[in-house]
A protein has these predicted regions:
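Extracytoplasmic/periplasmic, Sec-exported soluble proteins
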Residues: 23, 79, 89, 105-106, ...
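A small/polar (G/S/T-enriched), proline-flanked helix-loop surface module common
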Residues: 37-170
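Extracytoplasmic low-complexity, Pro/Thr/Ser/Ala/Gly-rich segments
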Residues: 2-80, 206-219
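Helix N-cap and loop-to-helix transition residues
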Residues: 13, 27, 94-95, 199
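Generic detector of well-ordered alpha-helical segments enriched in charged/polar residues
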Residues: 18, 22, 101, 111, ...
Length: 219
């Protein structure tokens, strides 16, 4: 079971948080059959819509976060029926902050705020892409504790659509976002399937790597 790692003496530094993220995140060569691109990088600061979602849900301010690092991006397949995967590691000041954020994010209010955020994001994207393929209706399903033996894990499964000018559905985009917490960190795996979902075997392989590294390292 992934539990709470004992904190190091004194506050966690940015350097410690980044080093932990680097030790846990997926890296080149981890996923056979996938090609990796770009280097691990610090995630951009949340935009206006994302900040509005956090305020709506009563979530923890991202200003309190010590570091959020995104892994290299893995891709496989053609443009249609392609697959994309990446991991993200967030480090916060204490396990209590992570626990509070995790509890709030699973409340019905937070789920409603997330749906509102996605709708607003899609509307803005469609305006920017006028005349090109539009984002259509979507569905969201949440699965609590999807990882056996792992406390405080979650899965958010999003099924998006892409529309032709006629309004007919051209493609489905399947986006699975897995997450779990350990000590002052939250680890996520995002798996995007174009045309069909990313195989569960590929998701399981990536998740096992992240779990093993999270248990083998401490902030």
């Amino acid at each position: 079971m992934v539990g709470v790692n004992p904190p190091a003496s004194g506050p966690i530094t940015k350097a410690q948080a980044v080093a932990y993220a680097h030790a846990v995140n997926l890296r080149a060569g981890d996923l056979p059959g996938f090609t990796s691109s770009r280097s691990e990088t610090e995630a951009p600061k949340p935009g206006q819509l994302a900040l509005e979602e956090i305020r709506c849900s009563g979530g923890v301010s991202p200003a309190r976060r010590i570091a959020k690092m995104e892994s290299t991006e893995f891709s496989s397949g053609r443009v249609f029926y392609g697959k994309v995967m990446k991991s993200t590691v967030e480090v916060w000041p204490t396990p209590a902050v992570v626990a509070s954020s995790n509890v709030l994010s699973h409340k019905s209010r937070a789920r409603a705020c997330f749906v509102r955020f996605l709708k607003a994001l899609h509307e803005r994207t469609n305006q920017e892409r006028k005349g090109r393929m539009q984002i259509g209706p979507f569905t969201i399903a949440t699965v609590p504790n999807p990882l056996p033996g792992v406390s405080d894990s979650f899965l958010t499964a999003i099924n998006e659509t892409r529309l032709l000018r006629s309004g007919a559905i051209r493609a489905h985009i399947y986006r699975d976002i897995f997450g779990f917490t350990t000590g002052p960190a939250e680890i996520e795996l995002e798996a995007i399937g174009i045309g069909r979902p990313v195989p569960t075997s590929a998701e399981a392989q990536a998740l096992q790597l992240l779990l093993d590294r999270a248990m083998a390292n401490t902030v």
